[in-house]
Amino acid sequence: MFHGSLVALVTPMHEDGRIDEAALERFIEWQIAEGTNGLVPVGTTGESPTLSHDEHKRVVEITVEVARKRVPVIAGAGSNATREAIGLAKHAESVGADGVLVVTPYYNKPTQDGLLRHFTAVADAIGIPLIIYNIPPRSVIDMSVATMARLAQHPNIVGVKDATANLTRPLHTTAACGASFCQLSGEDHTALAFLAAGGVGCISVTANIAPRLCAEMQAAWRAGDLKTAMAIQSRLLPLHDAMFAESNPAPAKYAASLLGFGSEFCRLPLAPLAEATKAQMRAAMTGLGLLA
């Protein structure tokens, strides 16, 4: 189903904070040309918490329209309000998204039973695949493997974006949910190790800037060429470090601006990058030949 390098798209903006639709369209075309295996708009990296509902939906619509089924689109549809998540998921389905990514509800700290009910309600409301997004550092709730196994029995819940950074999780998830449950890493630094533990791909922040290398690493692993996969991951390490030197997506948006895709602007409360972080990013990109 979903595999390889899927990019967690930034949302390009003008300097005044308006969404730069033309830059987004060019960015998507470039991503596909560079070999990205899938597009994931309006997630954490897409600044979904600071987008209005209309903006959120428009970004999904543009992504689907430009992609034209050349690669799958997994639209962000997360919320800490179940009714809102259902609405976003139904919109994504209505405009042609291939799946939805639904984050564990943040701030209100539901119990495991609450998580079970939330995801079941969203999955019941749509007819396209749903990927659970488990990211305890941001949501302050960790879905247990037992809860995930129960949700995996739902025909529309097909996998997880695992951003726990715990490399024992995919092993336990495979044991509980079966090998067909689609496990995608949400951590660029451990993406290769995640594959070795049972994953099938990565929803990547770094792929915003180095889509070809990220896709080639995933392809090398699938081809059984571990030496090449390890070499690419080693080359990417300085860029991974720069990408997460400050809160995502500020570094990624600065890097994208250097490539000509929108400005570096992030909506508050995300602040502009420190000059030292900008220098780190430029050095990492130059080292990979992404900047002259």
UniProtKB/Swiss-Prot annotation:
It catalyses: L-aspartate 4-semialdehyde + pyruvate = (2S,4S)-4-hydroxy-2,3,4,5-tetrahydrodipicolinate + H2O + H(+). One of its GO terms (molecular function) is 4-hydroxy-tetrahydrodipicolinate synthase activity. InterPro entries: Aldolase_TIM, DapA, DapA-like, Schiff_base-form_aldolases_AS, Schiff_base-form_aldolases_CS. The record marks T44, Y107 as: Part of a proton relay during catalysis. Signal peptide: none annotated. It is found in: Cytoplasm. GO terms for cellular component: cytosol. Belongs to the DapA family. This is 4-hydroxy-tetrahydrodipicolinate synthase. It comes from Acidiphilium cryptum (strain JF-5). The gene is dapA.
